[in-house]
Structure formats: C-alpha cells, structure tokens
UniProtKB/Swiss-Prot annotation:
Organism per entry: Mycolicibacterium smegmatis (Mycobacterium smegmatis)
Family membership noted in the UniProt record: Belongs to the peptidase S16 family.
Gene behind the chain: lon
Biological processes per GO annotation: cellular response to heat; protein quality control for misfolded or incompletely synthesized proteins
Domain Lon N-terminal: 7-190
Name the record gives this protein: Lon protease
Length: 779
C-alpha cells in the first residue's frame, strides 16, 4: 500500500462506486461540503464509501470530480469518477464542514497467468450476456479492457448484482478472488436468463399458435357457411350433436336434457373450456345403451350344463341362478308382469374364502343367462365419486364405475360383478359403501342418479353379483339389501374332481404337454390337497400342479425317452419338495393342557390349539395370543366354571390355586369370538387333572357359567377344516345340529360329529381315561 494521506469522505446510502465507474451524485449538504473540500484540496480527490449500519467501512474509492451541474429534475449534482481503491483509516480534522479521514491507496500487483485465465473466462461470460441483450457498444468497450482488475471493476454497472455483492467486490482487494466471485455470479445469472428467455419464447409461440388456430377456425366456419353446410344459428358441432340426438333411441327426459346442453354449446365461446365439458358429457350420454337390452336365455338345461362345465360344486349358487331363469321364463309365458313393476335384475353376494371360484363364477352366470359381463374391482376404493361419479363442476370430471360398466357392456341388463366389496374403505372423500346402498337396492336402483350424468339411470335389469371374503366387513345396511350365498370351500373329493376335470388339463396344456406324456395319479392328487396345500380353495393346488408340469416338461426336454411320465404319491418329493402340512393334532395334544378347537377366519375354517399351564405364584389368570375382548371373557367364564365344578370334574381345587396361563398360538394373529369356550374348559381340566386330550378330537362351542354349550356360527367351514386337519371326532353344540344339513355328505361320513349340550359330557369323552394318564406319568 502507498503512504497514508488525508482526504474528505462522502458516505453513500444506496450506491456502491467501484474504480473506473463514472456516476452522478446528488449534492445535499454533506455531499456539497465534501465536494467543496476536495476541490479546494491539493489532490482534488475525495473518498466515496458505503454507509454501513453494523460497522465502519474498511474500504472505499478515491474519486475525482469530473463535473458539477444539475440533474434533469433541477437538483444540483456532481459527476465523479472512481479512480483507485483505498483502505480507510482513522478520522482526522480538516478545513471546512466536510468529514476527513486518513486513507492508504491499494495497488494491484502484476497479473499472473492464473489471473489472466480467470479474466478471460469472466470476459467470455460477460460478452455472452451482453450479446444476448444486444448491447454491442458495451461489447466493444469490454473488448478494449486488458487490465484484469479494471475488467472486474466494470461489474459495478451490473444491474443483476445486489448491493451486498458489489460491496464484497469493493472490499476484495485480491484480483483473482474478485474474478472468481464474478464468474460464479455471472454464470448463474446467464443460466437464469436463458431459462427466462426460453419461457418467454414458448409463451409467445403458444399465443401465436392459438391466434392462428382461432383465425383458421373462423375462416373454416365462414367457408362451410358459404357452402351451405351450416345455418346462421349453428357452428357445425352443435348441429352434429342435434342430429345424433334425434337419431338415438333415448328416453324422453334424457333427450330433453341433451338438447338443453346442445343449446348451451351453441351459446358457448370457442375459447371457453365449457364447450369441451359439454361435448364430453354429450358423448357420454349418447354412448350409453339407454334402451338396449339383450334377450335372456330361459333354457334351464343349457344353463345347468354351462354352470356345471365351468365350476364343480357350488350347488347353492347354481340352484339360485336356475331358479332365477325359471321365474324369468314362467312369468311372461303366463302373461304376468314382474311384481312391483321393477326390472329383471337380482343382487347376490357370494361370500367365502379366496380361491373357491367366486369371481370366475360371474362369467359363467353371464354365459348361462346370455347376458354381457362386466367386472368392477372395488378393492381399495375409498372415494364415493368412484361409484357415483364426479360433479361436472370439477375439472376432469368422469362418470362413476357403475355408469362406465353399463357403457362398457353395451346393454342395460348385463351381469355386473362387484369384486371384493369387503375391501372398500372410507376417508374424507366419503364412503363408497354408502353410495352402493342405492345401486344394490332393488327398490331404488331403477332411478339411480350418477353425479356426472345428473340423469336417472335404470339399473333394475342388471344382475349384480358381489364377492366378499369376510361378511363382517360389509356394512349391515348394505348386506341387508343383498341375497347372501355362502361358499364355504371344497372338500377333499371336490378338490380331486376339480383337479382332474379342470386344473390338471389346463396346466398340462399350458406346459405344452398331453395326457399321453404326463399323468398324475389320484393318490398323488389327494396327497397334494391334504399335505401340500390345506386351503379352502384351489389356487395353491393349481400352482403346485403348474410346478409339477414345468418339471415334467423340463425332464422330457432333457430325456425324451422318459415319456410317458406318471407322477404318483412317492414321486411328489421330487416334483414338489417335502410336504408343508402334516397332521399335528396328536403331537400338539401329547401333553396335558392342550386342546384342539375350531375357528373361522377370512380364509375359511381352521384348527385352533389352546394351551393351558400353571406355575407357582399368586393365583390368577394370564392370557396371551392377541385375544379379543370376547375371547378374554370366554377364558374368564371357563376358569370360573372349572373352579365352581372342580369336584364334579375330578379336579383338585389346590391345582387351581396357582398362576394359570392360557395361550392361543399363533401369537402374531389377532383372535376373537365366543366359540373357543368349550376348548378352554377342556384345556384347563386337562392341565389340572394331568389327563391328555385325545389327539383325534376337535371341538367348538360357547360355554356358560353353568356349563351349557351354546350355538356358534361357521359349522360347515369348521367341519371342513377338521377333515383337512385329519381329525376324526368333532363336538358341536346341540342347537347347531340343523347346520349339518349344509355339510357335504362325504365330510359327515369322514367325521364322527357329536352334538352336545353340556361341557362336562365333552370333557368326559375328549380326555383320556385317568388310569392311562397315571400310567403315562409313571413311565
């Protein structure tokens, strides 16, 4: 730095002056005093520095006075030129009213190669930005600057830099650092400018295109009018819709509503989005089959043949469809109208575990009726508008799934399958299940009104088939409107027949095989059903058959001489691996305190093991296994009954004055319901007496404090599960005996089903004799 010298100082509030800049300064009292002092001084210079709120400025610019005059508004001003940076020292005294400070000039070192490289990079960015703005005079001026420091200080004129950035440039004495800052700031601004210019160009191009399209449409309309294709009241599109409405077979109210919308279309501006909304609505209305109905087939023999060909078993559903056809055929033949004046529709809910054929049954029903078939998946639907549609005030509004299904079917009397209705949810957008109340109510659905159409749609001719896994998840008001048909799963004989008649031929064909090349014995099929799947349906059964066919196809491809292949029971380990399910009831109940119960889940019936144990400690009852409130109460009732009737049951009361623990595996699965009462009593008595429960026995029923066995639900599913689990004796409540009429005969033949009224009788029959327990204990 040079020697210190004393100069008058002028602090500016809003401006930053860098070396090389020529700027006007309005002369207020302080500025005039500083300018006068500078002109009177020997050097003729003054220091211009920014006024900072938080600190005293460290650097300023020594400036010379170029001219004194007036601004266009008449105010006095001085034009100054920044000459050199200076470091500001302490204040001092001087002549006149001006403030004086001591300063030291900052001298720039000779530029290095790195400095020149940075200067070249910055100049390239600066010239690119100036050329984009067509500032060619400034381009010429910048090209003439060779000093890197002077080039960097031209940024004082840059409008895209903030006051803080310019002040940082003023205080940065290192030229390399100054150029690096400017390269970053200018590069960012240039990129932002390019994006803004691109957006502006896109907007301008879009506006020009829109104006061009508008002009061409006006010219096209004028040409068509001259050719006589239009009258003075239409615009082409509206007349086209009028003609389509007149030709369409529409109900009178629908025709009137459509013509009103055409009138709105004629009055709508071409630039208004309303025109597009009206056209979409008119297209939707005209595409619906308002008066189109297919003729039902009333051939009962043909219907039975179709249903039996596609599905094995399911007699309840098949009988209901045949009854429906019989009524449909008999009423017109006798000149009788449908009761109540409603249409020919029906609403049935097919409830059962997965894989029993509920969804595929819908297509078979449609074929049997000679009707169109449409499937509507409801799983995961949470928006009421999915059912009723969106109101036309919303952008992108569409009709609901019911209206779209009718349009897709092309008739007003299709078979509509509403799949997985128990998976419907609800949130802030409404409850789809509540919207289905009107759809599935035969007394109301002849005037179903979709929000989008806002017209009455007659759904009374539609056959609605609804599928569900868990009936309890369907709202009671909705379930009340439907005819319930429960499909409880297949027996072992059913699965064998399905595999031989449906699954095996299909998977053999998919594997490119024939019956001459690969066969599966009946024993192998029964083994797969019993030890590899153990499911109510046949989905996993079919997957395993597909796996076996793939392995057989691979074997034949590697060794063609291996044909024909016969897969028998001993060969299953080679094709399917080891069995996944083995009879375990005998193993589970091999110790006292374990009883086998029966339960119903969303996947059908299943066995439920209840374990009881006792330990030293304060008397009490501990329950584990994620039990629900009802099941916890059943455990309390069972414990109270055993305590009260200990003598009759042969239980030592002291054995119950311990810490009793009841556990229901699996612990990660929530469980609830009253039907485990008798099983809990049996497990407690077995634990207290040391007598094991017979391994081939299962039981179900609710128990009272007096030991009465009350009826429960799901008898058919539970007996099917007992057969799959390899049980031979099942105890059920006496009042559930009428439910045995619904159980397949082969299941009843395989099981010894004993209706009981008193839990004491169940205990006497289910527990091993006392002398056997004593012998086992001694051994």
């Amino acid at each position: 730095m040079a020697e210190a010298k004393t100069v008058p100082v002028l602090f500016l509030n809003d401006s930053i002056v860098l070396p090389g800049m020529v700027v006007p300064i309005e002369l207020d009292d302080a500025a005039r005093a500083a300018v006068d002092a500078a002109r009177a001084s020997e050097s003729g210079e003054l220091l211009i520095a920014p006024r900072l709120e938080d600190r005293y400025p460290a650097y300023g610019v020594l400036a010379s006075i170029v001219q004194i005059g007036r601004l266009p508004n008449g105010d006095a001003a001085a034009v100054v030129r920044g000459e050199r940076r200076a470091h500001i020292g302490s204040g001092t005294s001087g002549p006149g009213a001006a403030l004086w400070v001591q300063v030291e000039e900052v001298t720039d070192p000779e530029p290095t190669d790195e400095t020149k490289k940075l200067a070249g990079e910055y100049k390239k960015l600066l010239l690119a930005m100036l050329q984009r703005r067509d500032a060619w005079q400034i381009v010429d001026m910048v090209n003439k600057i060779t000093d890197p420091s002077a080039l960097a200080d031209t940024a004082g004129y840059a409008s895209y830099l903030t006051g803080t950035q310019k002040r940082e440039l003023l205080e940065t004495t290192d030229v390399d650092r100054r150029l690096s800052l400017l390269i970053g700031w200018t590069g960012d601004h240039l990129a932002e400018t390019e994006v803004n210019d691109k957006i502006a160009e896109d907007v301008r191009t879009g506006m020009e295109k829109q104006q061009k399209e508008f002009l061409l449409r006006q010219q096209l309309a004028a040409i068509r009018k001259e050719l006589g294709e239009l009258d003075d009241n239409g615009d082409g599109s509206s007349d086209d819709y009028r003609a389509r409405i007149e030709q369409a077979d529409l109900p009178e109210k629908v025709r009137e509503a459509a013509l009103r919308e055409v009138g709105k279309l004629e009055r709508a501006s071409d630039q208004s989005p309303e025109g597009g909304w009206i056209r979409t609505w008119l297209d939707t209305v005209l595409d619906l089959p308002w008066n189109v109905r297919t003729e039902d087939s009333t051939d009962l023999a043909r219907a039975r043949e179709i249903l039996d060909t596609d599905h094995h078993g399911l007699s309840d559903v098949k009988d209901r469809i045949v009854e429906y056809l019989a009524v449909r055929g008999a009423a017109p033949q006798r000149g009788m109208a449908v009761v109540g004046g409603r249409g020919s529709g029906a609403v049935m809910v097919l409830a059962g575990p997965p894989g029993v054929g509920k969804t595929s049954l819908g297509e078979s029903v449609a074929r049997a009726l000679d009707r169109k078939f449409v499937r509507v998946a409801l799983g995961g639907v949470r928006d009421e508008a999915e059912i009723r549609g969106h109101r036309r005030t919303y952008v992108g509004a569409l009709p609901g799934r019911i209206v779209r299904a009718i349009g897709e079917a092309g008739s007003m009397n299709p078979v509509v399958l509403l799949d997985e209705i128990d998976k419907v949810g609800s949130d802030y957008r409404g409850d789809p299940a509540a919207a289905l109340l009107e759809v599935l109510d035969p007394a109301q659905n002849h005037t179903f009104r979709d929000h989008y159409l806002d017209l009455d749609l007659d759904l009374s001719d539609v056959v609605f088939l609804v599928t569900a896994n868990v009936i309890e998840n369907i709202p009671s008001a909705l379930l009340d409107r439907m005819e319930l048909v429960e499909i409880d799963g297949y027996t072992a004989d059913d699965k064998l027949a399905i595999a031989q008649g449906f699954l095996l031929p299909r998977q053999r064909e998919r594997g490119g095989l024939t019956s001459d090349e690969v066969t599966v014995t009946e024993a192998a099929l029964r083994k797969i059903a019993a030890d590899y799947t153990r499911e109510p349906g046949v989905r996993q059964f079919e997957r395993l058959l597909a796996k076996a066919m793939r392995k057989a196809a691979t074997k034949l491809a590697d060794h063609p001489q291996a044909a024909p292949i016969t897969i028998d029971e001993p060969d299953l380990v080679e094709y399917l691996g080891r069995p996944r399910f083995l009879p375990e009831s005998a193993e589970r109940t091999a110790v006292p305190g374990v009883a086998t119960g029966l339960a119903v889940t969303g996947l059908g019936g299943d066995v439920l093991y209840i374990e009881a144990n006792s330990t030293e400690g304060e008397p009490g009852l501990q329950l584990t296994g994620q039990l629900g409130d009802v099941m916890k109460e059943s455990a309390q009732i069972a414990m109270s009954y055993v305590r009260a009737h200990a003598k009759q049951l042969g239980v030592d009361p002291e054995a119950l004055n311990r810490r009793i623990h009841i556990h229901v595996p699996a612990g990660a699965v929530p469980k609830d319901g009253p039907s485990a009462g008798v099983t809990m009593v049996t497990a407690l008595v077995s634990m207290a007496t040391g007598r094991k429960v017979r391994g081939d026995v299962g039981m179900t029923g609710e128990v009272t404090l007096n030991g009465r066995v009350l009826p429960i639900g799901g008898v058919k599913q539970k007996l099917l599960a007992a057969q799959r689990a390899g049980l031979s004796t099942v105890f059920i409540p006496q009042r559930n005996q009428p439910d045995l009429d619904d159980v397949p005969a082969d299941v009843l033949d395989a099981l010894d089903v004993r209706p009981m009224t008193d839990v004491a009788d169940i205990i006497a029959a289910a527990l091993e004799p006392a002398h056997e327990a004593s012998t086992a204990a001694a051994a």
